[in-house]
UniProtKB/Swiss-Prot annotation:
This is Acyl-homoserine-lactone synthase. It comes from the Bacteria. SUPFAM superfamilies: Acyl-CoA N-acyltransferases (Nat). It comes from Pectobacterium parmentieri. GO terms for molecular function: N-acyl homoserine lactone synthase activity. The gene is expI. Keywords: Autoinducer synthesis, Quorum sensing, S-adenosyl-L-methionine, Transferase, Virulence.
């Protein structure tokens, strides 16, 4: 059963941090060839600090997917690393979080979960549920065009705030991701259209994708 939960940087174990940063290196350096710094086979940066919280999607104690969340009042990639990619960036004051370093380990996902789980959409729902549980008003993130397409396909009513150009001369987008009840409903319906999971569990945090069981007798 896939479970998604949050862990603050200060509570991140050495074992789990090594697994996370190794998977990030395999995703962002090896597969996507981003301009990221890697040490000892791991990718981490100045934003992996006490202000960071990580969402983990785990099956059988193995990390399948993850992202890093930072309240926008703290230093983050939008106002730091990615700022030069845009002509202007104006994040409003309020209870907002920045999401970065989102990935799904495709090999692990296929091996452990098979091809039937919409893991990205499940993780988007987790982001909504986490944000609602903590009282946040929304999420800001910067994505590539392929990730923009994946987000749109999920049905999540995202909005493009700004467009920019990366160091690889590829289009990137600053997005606002709403975390209201409508967003939650849309993602729950998309994930559970075949009634595979216990729906009440899909609106909770932490998030568990508990399969429906056949009635006995």
């Amino acid at each position: 059963m896939l479970e998604i939960f949050d862990v603050s940087y200060t509570l991140l174990s050495e074992k789990k941090s090594e697994e996370l940063f190794t998977l990030r290196k395999e995703t962002f350096k090896d597969r996507l060839n981003w301009a990221v710094k890697c040490i000892n086979g791991m990718e981490f940066d100045q934003y992996d600090d006490d202000n960071a919280t990580y969402l983990f999607g785990v099956e059988g104690d193995q990390v399948i997917c993850s992202s890093r969340l930072i309240e926008t009042k703290y230093p983050n990639m939008i106002t730091g690393t990615f700022f030069p990619y845009f002509e202007k960036i104006d994040i409003p004051e309020g209870k907002y979080i920045e999401s970065s370093r989102f990935f799904v380990d495709k090999a692990r996902s296929k091996t452990i979960l098979g091809n039937s789980y919409p893991v990205s959409t499940m993780f988007f729902l987790a982001t909504v549920n986490y944000s609602k549980s903590k009282g946040y008003d929304g999420v800001y993130t910067i994505v590539s065009h392929p990730m923009l397409t994946i987000l749109k396909r999920s049905g999540w009513k995202i909005s493009i705030v700004e467009q920019g150009m990366s160091e690889k001369h590829e289009r990137v987008y600053l997005l606002f991701l709403p975390v209201d009840n409508e967003s939650q409903d849309v993602l729950v319906r998309r994930i559970n259209h075949n009634q595979e999971f216990v729906e009440s569990k899909l609106r909770e945090w932490p998030l568990s994708f508990e399969p429906m069981t056949e009635p006995v007798g």
